[in-house]
Amino acid sequence: MTGPLTTAEIREKFLSFFESKGHLRLPSHSLIAPDPTTLFTVAGMQPFKPQFMGAPAKFPGYGENRRVTTAQKCIRVGDIENVGRTRRHLSLFEMMGNFSFGDYFKREAILWAWEFLTSPEWLGMDPARMYVTIYEDDNEAFGYWTQDVGLPEDHIHRFGADENFWPADAPAKGPNGPCGPCSEIYYDRGPHYGDDTWADYAQTRESARFLEVWNLVFPQYDRQDGGVLADLPFKNIDTGMGLERVASVVQDVPDFYSNDVFRPLVEKVAELSGKPYEGEVSVSHRVVAEHIRSVAMTIADGVALSNTGRGYVIRKILRRASRHAYLLGLHEPTLYRLVPLVVQAMGGAYPELVTEEARVTAAIRAEEERFLKTLESGMQRLSGLLEGMERGAVLPGEEAFLLYDTYGFPLDLTKEIAEEYGISVNEAEYAESLERAQETARAASKYGKSELFGGSQEALEGLPPTQFVGYDELEAQGEVLALVGAGERLDHLMAGSEATVVLSRTPFYAEGGGEVGDTGVLEWEGGRGLVRDTRKTPAGIWLHDVLVEEGELTPGVTVRGVVSSERQAIQRHHTATHLLHAALRAVLGPGVRQAGSLVAPERLRFDFTHGAALTADELGQVERLVSRWVTANFPVTWREMPLAEAKAAGATALFGEKYGDTVRVVRVEGGIPFGDATVTSMELCGGAHVTRTGDIGAFVIVSDENVAAGVRRIEALAGEAATAWVRAQLNNVHRVSGLLNTSPDTLETRVIGLQSQLRAAQQETAQARRQLAEAQMGGASTQQVRELGGFKVAVLRLSGIEGGELRGAADKLLDQSGADLAVIASDKGLVVKASKTAVARGAHAGQLIGKLAAAGGGKGGGRPDMAQAGIGNPEAALAALDTAF
């Protein structure tokens, strides 16, 4: 080899090599999947699905070329639990690839792969240590490897379709569609990684010595019914080389975590935790190092931590890292301090990490703080479970998994805490629960070849793209091209039936860009149907969900589509959304980025990146800016233009969105002065809008809330919806004013006065309760001290005392009595207080109260020094003291 190249140098060499072979170098696509069937980009070829399906190899802003090379960042989470536990599983990885869309084929792919791997100019690997696998019937590849490359035959293994075909076992099991053999390239790392041979590997397919570094896929067949493999009219090349894999070979390190990207992260984790990277604890070092890279890069790509979709997956990854940091003794937010190391390692190839570093850091820190509080809640939950169990008992595995799934407790932490109580965990039950959850996760993230190359759209095959005229027309005629129900073509649709209707021409806007799909009616001679929703396929086919009310609908009939009047309300809210976006950027700064939206007839919802709640002044500024636009009654125009021209003109694009060569730009023809600047609105958008800002009518912000770490959500109303909301608020003010015998003008003063009176009454009540407790305690605390289990326990029964007064009474009783523990029972409450000396001797208030509360018909828990519970029978709880020690 030429020497220990860095990961960045390997990446650059790969891309430069294929540029020298006439390939177009393209940047990595966002981790947000370009295909709606998956959450994340999971394969290097995924962004090129249209080209593999025959679309022109045109790439806006970069040119046209049927040869492409990329280093694509990818995320796969189906086996997330293995990350860190093994040294070769990653959730985020870089897949370098070269692709041919009907250009070169097998020979060039094999020869160029060999040249890049073995030439001293490139990676310079030892040819004698190279091995390959091929599909058992692929004599063409065998010939290229042996005759053109010169690889010895005993360095080649043939395998069946289950190993060397893509998709696996496609000839026998399908799916129908493009498929083909593949050839995998392996490198022999030497005897210090194992004493197995290449022949051994052929039998076991497991080896630390023989490492796969590249997979060359040759999609050359069209799999048809009966397992027939027909030749494709054009043949493609799809290769994938894992950058982390090849880096471990080139740098001659034992695993991914020892390469130049992960090593600094692992070392920093060891430094922060004070625990060296060795032994069993090293799993946690690896989890933290790997996951922080995944989370940082995904947030930089625009994914907001949330409770659904992509945001939920990334939040789970971050919380897994936080759990392992906790196991390392890092009980304060720490992961965010690793972000600069990720930026240093990856920012050169992915500049969005550099520009988004501050936002990424803030989002991770906020989520850490939130999760650590949740972790504390989990500790209380676990303590409550364990305190009600006898020593030697077994904690159900389902409970352990719920702690993991709800509070983020890893099994190791649950076992460690349970051992302190002399309790074990049913790990078999835990494993069963975990496997069920993992099966669900794998199903959600599965990305097979049938999805990459279609396969479930048979009912729509052969249909042309729908002509959409709804920007200018709310009524239009079109021919019924197809009726689809339950995935099949229908020959008619009777009254009372519902199905999907495909038209040649439509005025109905299809759901997209946050805007809901249009509703309305279809009318034809002798019939009528309700359009309940409108969607579209990636191929541009409009899908109308139609319920036939009258008559019969058949293919070939000409219908008149009439869009509902709700469209006008949708247009008001959509244009208002653009103005809101521009106003937020003006008031809060250019770092504001759209993170999601909903445009509906009754409201708009806008999610955006911002680290703090908006002040009343900021909300007021935003609302006034939008209202000034409305009052100005500027024209709203749109036109189509090349993507490069739109970007040069300053049009706002949705981060991570994939655009074509030509884009639609919606512009408000006028700006609003704000400070030293003039605020304008121009966005790439395919939605429906008003023709003038004055058509919005009115605008009001009704809420601002946090929805995820670093993401805010504003809900607002426009037009009649805004007017109705304002009227409802005024009615509420008048009604409440009447109830309080005041006028709207003096309502605030009246409420402030009532609050002051309430606080004074609450203080008087608290004082009375304290006095009642002191009166009941009297001076007889020494007579209430009992000797139990080697501890002096002061016991007291009170009446009418609860909450904070009960805890205060326990503090006082412990001080007055000089006892080790104080136990006080009231009508509905129980409290146990232990002195520091007693805790040091093994006393545990939380464990004791668990037993007493159970006897008193309640439950509770707490810390070793203080615990509280709700009970129904205080006498029974106190009676249980004799057996509780």
Curated annotation (Swiss-Prot):
Which SMART domains is this protein grouped with? tRNA_SAD
Q: Which PROSITE patterns match?
A: AA_TRNA_LIGASE_II_ALA
Indicate the principal place this protein occupies in or around the cell: cytoplasm
One Pfam family named in its UniProt record: tRNA-synt_2c
Cited InterPro entries: aa-tRNA-synth_II/BPL/LPL, Ala-tRNA-lgiase_IIc, Ala-tRNA-ligase_IIc_anticod-bd, Ala-tRNA-synth_IIc_core, Ala-tRNA-synth_IIc_N, Ala-tRNA_ligase, Ala_tRNA_ligase_euk/bac, DHHA1_dom
Which GO cellular component term is one of those annotated?
cytosol
Subcellular location, record wording: Cytoplasm
Q: Which cofactor does it need?
A: Zn(2+)
Instruction: Locate the residues binding Zn(2+).
Output: H574, H578, C685, H689
Keyword list, A-Z = Aminoacyl-tRNA synthetase, ATP-binding, Cytoplasm, Ligase, Metal-binding, Nucleotide-binding, Protein biosynthesis, RNA-binding, tRNA-binding, Zinc
Tell me the cofactor note: Binds 1 zinc ion per subunit.
Q: Which reaction does it catalyse?
A: tRNA(Ala) + L-alanine + ATP = L-alanyl-tRNA(Ala) + AMP + diphosphate
GO-annotated molecular function: alanine-tRNA ligase activity; aminoacyl-tRNA deacylase activity; ATP binding; tRNA binding; zinc ion binding
Question: What's its job?
Answer: Catalyzes the attachment of alanine to tRNA(Ala) in a two-step reaction: alanine is first activated by ATP to form Ala-AMP and then transferred to the acceptor end of tRNA(Ala). Also edits incorrectly charged Ser-tRNA(Ala) and Gly-tRNA(Ala) via its editing domain.
Which NCBIfam families does UniProt cross-reference here? alaS (TIGR00344)
> What information about domains appears in the record's comments?
Consists of three domains; the N-terminal catalytic domain, the editing domain and the C-terminal C-Ala domain. The editing domain removes incorrectly charged amino acids, while the C-Ala domain, along with tRNA(Ala), serves as a bridge to cooperatively bring together the editing and aminoacylation centers thus stimulating deacylation of misacylated tRNAs.
In its UniProt entry, what is this protein called? Alanine--tRNA ligase
> What organism is this sequence from?
Deinococcus geothermalis (strain DSM 11300 / CIP 105573 / AG-3a)
